[in-house]
Amino acid sequence: MTNYAIILAAGKGTRMKSDLPKVLHQVAGLTMLEHVKRAVDTMNPAKTVTVVGHKAELVQKVLEDQSEFVLQSEQLGTGHAVMMAESSLAELEGQTLVIAGDTPLIRGESLKNLLHYHKSHKNVATILTAEADDPFGYGRIIRNQNAEVIKIVEQKDASDYEQQVKEINTGTYVFDNKRLFEALKEINTNNAQGEYYLTDVISIFKEADEKVGAYKLADFDESLGVNDRVALAKAEKVMRRRINHAHMVNGVTLTNPASTYIDSDVIIAPDVVIEANVTLKGQTKIETGAVLTNGTYIVDSVIGENTVITHSMIEASRIEKNVTVGPYAHLRPNSVLEEAVHVGNFVEVKASTLGKETKAGHLTYIGNAEVGHDVNFGAGTITVNYDGQNKYKTIIGNHVFVGSNSTIIAPLTIGDNALTAAGSTIHKDVPVDSIAIGRGRQVNKEGYAKKKPHHPNNK
């Protein structure tokens, strides 16, 4: 049977108190909508239709060519939202999943189980349900004495008895596609909210004596719909717990999982050690044997085998194997550290490549530079790469020794095996095998200090 999907993503999310559409708030590095779409993709739908409304262009940009889009210009309820997909789906044979775009914790495996249950029981509609300790605010699943689903009642429309029911509607369903759109023509706004409830189609099916079933989630957390920042924080916590657990099962050591923040798309090899208070974001990849110590922050970067990062920040950079970084180093975007490089405390590297076995031990800024292998930067070295309007490149060859407190004014080239004297300002090219000295000659004036107030003889 052919599968289709409708993702409901039109709402503003007033309780989020945000200019950003609700479904675009992030959980573990992805928007809620992206989490839902990935779960939906596990069922291999022939067509996915996303219903957009508030700031539709922003929502569409997230999925781009991954979905069809239909516009719900007025938000008149979930039933009305699904009606918007009629022109795309109504005439197709198959089964259609309807899911809200603000349910980021739903697992693809659960959706596949829901579809299998729906098909194997020959239902016209199947509701994804969950058991809630506190069901307040959720629609309730009402069953008869034979445990058959007879209707869904929204919180505001529920009787006192119905409000005691703990089985709740998660807002996710599978329908026979054609019957769904036929039933939608029969619903109305005769309810406390004055909206078209999608749940009313369940009553229509029951009145027609058609088979309606319910598949209950084993994990209530999957049912969480995010309507405010409190729920967003809860979703974040649950998702990060899942992510961390998966990495540990796969051979990664997390010394304190509760304080480790790893985004959804981060890839980590076995035998990586991650200490407390580490954050890994975006498209980061950590290779085997790496050690990330307390307080390290890495985004969109590759960290090579057996590299040690100590309390440092790495952004959009590539670090090869056997490198040491930190403490308190900062690699800004487009930096490359080749094998066995050492970047020490209070060193900043920006848009530069450092060749194999190069060392910048402390208090150094390297920007817009191409550095060869086995180069040593003395403390206090600065590449002066910006004149207020343009950035300029520094090229440093192999086996160069840069003396402490050197200021290198780009653009220039320092040749292989050259040296710069400590304290020099270098503003011209330095030839191969040369030493560059760019500082004033020292002059000692004997006895001069005796005239100054600090001298003991003058106190």
Curated annotation (Swiss-Prot):
Pathway it works in: Nucleotide-sugar biosynthesis; UDP-N-acetyl-alpha-D-glucosamine biosynthesis; N-acetyl-alpha-D-glucosamine 1-phosphate from alpha-D-glucosamine 6-phosphate (route II): step 2/2; Nucleotide-sugar biosynthesis; UDP-N-acetyl-alpha-D-glucosamine biosynthesis; UDP-N-acetyl-alpha-D-glucosamine from N-acetyl-alpha-D-glucosamine 1-phosphate: step 1/1; Bacterial outer membrane biogenesis; LPS lipid A biosynthesis
Region (N-acetyltransferase): 251-459
Binding-site list for UDP-N-acetyl-alpha-D-glucosamine: 8-11, 22, 72, 77-78, 139, 154, 169, 227, 332, 350, 365, 376
Reactions accelerated catalytically: alpha-D-glucosamine 1-phosphate + acetyl-CoA = N-acetyl-alpha-D-glucosamine 1-phosphate + CoA + H(+); N-acetyl-alpha-D-glucosamine 1-phosphate + UTP + H(+) = UDP-N-acetyl-alpha-D-glucosamine + diphosphate
GO molecular function: glucosamine-1-phosphate N-acetyltransferase activity; magnesium ion binding; UDP-N-acetylglucosamine diphosphorylase activity
E.C. code: 2.7.7.23, 2.3.1.157
Active site: H362
Binding sites annotated in the UniProt record for Mg(2+): D102, N227
Quaternary context: Homotrimer.
Annotated family: In the N-terminal section; belongs to the N-acetylglucosamine-1-phosphate uridyltransferase family.
NCBIfam families reported in the protein's UniProt record: glmU, PRK14354.1
Record function comment: Catalyzes the last two sequential reactions in the de novo biosynthetic pathway for UDP-N-acetylglucosamine (UDP-GlcNAc). The C-terminal domain catalyzes the transfer of acetyl group from acetyl coenzyme A to glucosamine-1-phosphate (GlcN-1-P) to produce N-acetylglucosamine-1-phosphate (GlcNAc-1-P), which is converted into UDP-GlcNAc by the transfer of uridine 5-monophosphate (from uridine 5-triphosphate), a reaction catalyzed by the N-terminal domain.
Protein name: Bifunctional protein GlmU
